[in-house]
Design a protein with these regions (language model features):
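Walker A/P-loop
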Residues: 32
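Metal-dependent nucleotidyltransferase catalytic core
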Residues: 156, 160-172, 207, 214, ...
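Helical scaffold of the NTase/Pol beta-like nucleotidyltransferase catalytic core
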Residues: 18-21, 110, 199, 204-260
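Small-molecule kinase domains that catalyze NTP-dependent phosphoryl transfer to phosphate-bearing small molecules
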Residues: 111-112, 139-140, 160-211
Length: 422
């Protein structure tokens, strides 16, 4: 819960432009090394561990609250907090631990908010949170950076550099998130196994090639775009989509009826453009408009000129040619490292339903998947060599359109035959 308080502080105080990066990693992985480089490059560092110590220094209201709750025997002779003495009292039972959290964590959250409020509107805020993964805090940040070192190397560092007993080192590592959990949360994975300084160039490249353009895109309302060319299916697309969905869910709150990974990247084994497609289902377009600013702040600005899908002919099964019910809102990711299209459609309208149907049809039918792959390959060839992005997309979509007009009817026939439901 304390991590949520810290993160809510970040979101309540920020101006709507700054980029928020969550930095974490297992004990002994060296995330402080990465934080140092990011700070040298201009990042605004918010270190949760440092703040947790700061808010209970001598003379602070935090320390006074601790002594009022746990007694003056938690103080050292010089008046500072005796942390082992506090731990002996606060971690002996669940009720005491809750009392400790209720004192310290809101103070850390408030101090975090102060730091963020003092940052420039175009800042890159780096929030160092040791238990970010364990606290499921990824959606609160535009990006999560994981610093990784394998467990044995971390044990060696903890025992050799910090003098920690091996049993304690292994116990602390075992109590933290697994590597699989960290990989699922990581937008950026930094392997810090090498010698000191070996990751510095990687961190600088991250800053220059992704963080700075990402922040600028958010501030200027620019969507990251890629040319419509097919790439080999990437198993990582599914985890990437899950992280995007989590961020969108946080931004939309109860305005979203459901949020789904759609399109070719949602079909395992299907080659596709390296762009994640997500559909947010809403009750009405007024709801879509009401969350436009939250989505921009979350890193998904709106594209004003893409507010409809092309109606499909009414062949008697699922078809509806009325343009009004093919309206939508379109947002896109500002992250140059993970382009994404975000389609906001109304629950039950034909474009909303077909997006789900088409995905499931492709997943279920190998022959259709192969057929569609060929169509996309030819569409990419039609767009190849066209340097203007809008023109390339138009050529790509026009090449697919005739097939889709027929596929719409075929998909709905499959839906009736299989009793498909969204």
């Amino acid at each position: 819960m304390h991590l949520r308080l810290v993160c809510f502080g970040v979101f309540e105080c920020q101006t709507g432009c700054m980029l928020r990066l969550g930095l974490t990693g297992g004990i002994g992985a060296g995330k402080s090394t990465v934080a140092k480089v990011l700070t040298e490059l201009g990042g605004v560092l918010v270190d949760s561990d440092v703040l947790a110590r700061e808010v209970v220094e001598p003379g602070t209201p935090g320390l006074q609250q601790l002594t009022d709750t746990f007694g003056t025997d938690i103080l050292a002779p010089d008046g500072s907090l005796d942390r082992p003495a506090l731990a002996a009292k606060a971690f002996g039972d669940e009720e005491s631990r809750k009392k400790l959290n209720a004192i310290v964590h809101p103070l850390v959250g408030a101090r975090t908010a102060e730091i963020i409020d003092g940052a420039a509107s175009d800042a890159v805020v780096v929030q160092d949170i040791p238990l970010l993964v364990e606290g499921s805090m990824g959606p609160f940040f535009h990006l999560v950076v994981i610093v990784w070192v394998d467990a044995e190397e971390r044990v060696r560092r903890l025992t050799g550099q910090r003098g920690m007993p091996e049993a304690d080192a292994r116990a602390r590592i075992a109590a933290q998130a697994t590597d699989d959990a960290r990989r699922a949360a990581a937008d950026v994975w930094i392997d810090n196994t090498g010698a000191p300084g070996s990751v510095d160039d990687d961190v600088r490249a991250l800053w220059n090639d992704r963080l700075i353009p990402f922040e600028r895109n958010i501030r200027e309302g620019v969507i990251a775009r890629v040319h419509p060319e097919q790439v080999t299916a990437d198993p990582a697309w599914e985890l990437q989509a899950r992280r995007i969905v989590s961020r969108l869910a946080l931004a939309c709150s109860d305005k979203a009826v459901r949020i789904d990974h759609i399109g070719s990247t949602a079909v395992p084994g299907l080659d596709a453009k390296d762009v994640i497609d997500i559909q947010i289902t809403v009750r009405g377009l007024d709801d879509a408009d009401s969350v436009a600013e939250q989505l921009r702040v979350a890193g998904f600005p709106r594209r004003e000129d893409a507010d409809f899908d092309h109606p499909k002919p009414a062949y008697g099964i699922g078809g509806e040619a009325d343009p009004a019910v093919w309206s939508k809102r379109f947002h896109g990711s500002a992250d140059p490292g993970r382009p994404a299209n975000v389609h906001i459609r109304v629950d039950g309208w034909p474009n909303q339903t077909f997006a789900l149907l088409f995905r499931d049809w492709l997943r279920a039918d190998d022959s259709i998947r192969t057929e569609y792959s060929g169509i996309k390959r030819r569409a990419s060839e039609a767009a190849a060599g066209i340097t203007d992005f809008a023109s390339a997309i138009e050529a790509y979509e026009n090449a697919k359109a005739p097939w889709f007009d027929v596929a719409y009817r075929r998909a709905w026939q499959w839906a009736e035959e299989t009793n498909w439901t969204a």
